[in-house]
Amino acid sequence: MPEINVMERGRELVVNPLVTCQPFGAMFATLGIRRGLPLVHGSQGCSTFVRYGLNRHFREPAEIAVTSLHEDAAVFGGRSNIINGVKNLVKRFRPDLVGIVTTCSSEIIGDDVDGFMRVAETELREELGDRFQTKLVHISTPSFVENHFRGYGNAIKSFIETLSREDGDCNHKLNIIPGIVNPGDIREIGHMLGLMDITPIILTDTSDPFDSPLRPSKTEQMPFYPPGGTAVPEIEDSSNSMGTLSLTMYGDEALNTLEKRFRVPGEYSMPIGVRNTDDFVRRAARISEKDVSDELLDERGILIDSMADLSSRYLFGRTAAVYGDPDMVAGISRFLCELGITPLHTCTGTDNELFIDRMKTVAAEADERINVMVKSDLRALEERLSEEPVDLMIGNSDGRLIAQDLGIPLVRVGYPVYDRVGYQRVPITGYRGAVNLLNRITNTVLREYYEPQHWKLQQ
């Protein structure tokens, strides 16, 4: 049986990284809460860098506050920074939730964030009385360990631990932990579940906050917030759901919390490609005790028909390199095998064991040996591609210069995509998303390998 060749970058220095620090993931998750604001307990750059990245990808503003730690706070602590920051946010913006996100600075100096948060709550209750309704959630995200995927998972876990309340009655809903995906993907998941008559609780829903028209507030007294997002009562009600499906491997701690504390079963399933989407649909149907609708079967049939039209003619026998988010890399790699493309090189900045297990499955199904680069970076991928080139690269915009230098066409997916527009609205999940991805891959192959010889297009 073919095996995977697991490789690490072999050096301490990271060049052109594939991951960033934990606070990014926590900020992203908090922005998916209706009238939610992240308050970053760190220096100004900790929020500026994230806002810049989100603006480039989504072309939308990201409201992120910061306690603005300076040299004095590094010595004497950031007590006043948190208390004043929370009070200013609550009084001026009246959010439903403030997620207090720690950074390397605040974690290293050992700030008692929970204690400072309680002081701020006490003072706000004294000043505002019943008008103080904001939920405060402490999210621990030390930047010097793990990555932004773990930061996202820590945020979801913190929301559940702080807010969820079990009332004993099942709400007949299905929790969905989407991970760091695009608005189009979240909407596609909602569409599929809607066809099965399943009501989801998205933990958390970043679709409308990052892709909606900006409208003024109805009254001058009501601060502006983007529409959509997961309401705080929905998070509180997540403990009464029938089950949870996580689209990210880093939703494991949130799944464990819901299962152990509230007896809500949880499973992992990322619906990219035919088999993975079949798996997602079956799990959702089993947990929710619902039937798969004819409309969903029709969407699957359209995907299979598209694959029959295109795979053997244009794609079979080609090779690809896939890099980025481990959930996306594993899902796309399996879909490539379904198309007859060998994912010869896969590269991610993490070393998640579930990712390695998934890639073993991909190698077995492809009947090919696959290079799986973990805890790696784009420099290592570039070196590998220089030695063993492929027909396609599939990943985010950070690999564009490598693709240009090596003359390999790049199919852009995931986060971030900043040198093309509209990609955040086009799903790659579900059956319809797989059709989108298939068309994108095929059109790239046609442009690169068929257009230079126009006679091939007539065959």
Curated annotation (Swiss-Prot):
Cofactor binding: number and manner: Binds 1 [8Fe-7S] cluster per heterodimer.
Top-level lineage group: Archaea
Reaction catalyzed: N2 + 8 reduced [2Fe-2S]-[ferredoxin] + 16 ATP + 16 H2O = H2 + 8 oxidized [2Fe-2S]-[ferredoxin] + 2 NH4(+) + 16 ADP + 16 phosphate + 6 H(+)
Keywords: ATP-binding, Iron, Iron-sulfur, Metal-binding, Nitrogen fixation, Nucleotide-binding, Oxidoreductase
Chain sites annotated for binding [8Fe-7S] cluster: C21, C46, C104, S143
Cofactor: [8Fe-7S] cluster
CDD domains: Nitrogenase_MoFe_beta_like
Cleavable signal peptide: none
An example molecular function term from Gene Ontology annotations: iron-sulfur cluster binding
EC number(s) on file: 1.18.6.1
GO biological process terms held by the UniProt record: nitrogen fixation
Family: Belongs to the NifD/NifK/NifE/NifN family.
Subunit: Tetramer of two alpha and two beta chains. Forms complex with the iron protein (nitrogenase component 2).
Stated role: This molybdenum-iron protein is part of the nitrogenase complex that catalyzes the key enzymatic reactions in nitrogen fixation.
PANTHER family: LIGHT-INDEPENDENT PROTOCHLOROPHYLLIDE REDUCTASE SUBUNIT B (PTHR33712:SF7)
Name of this protein: Nitrogenase molybdenum-iron protein beta chain
Protein's organism: Methanothermobacter marburgensis (strain ATCC BAA-927 / DSM 2133 / JCM 14651 / NBRC 100331 / OCM 82 / Marburg) (Methanobacterium thermoautotrophicum)
Gene: nifK
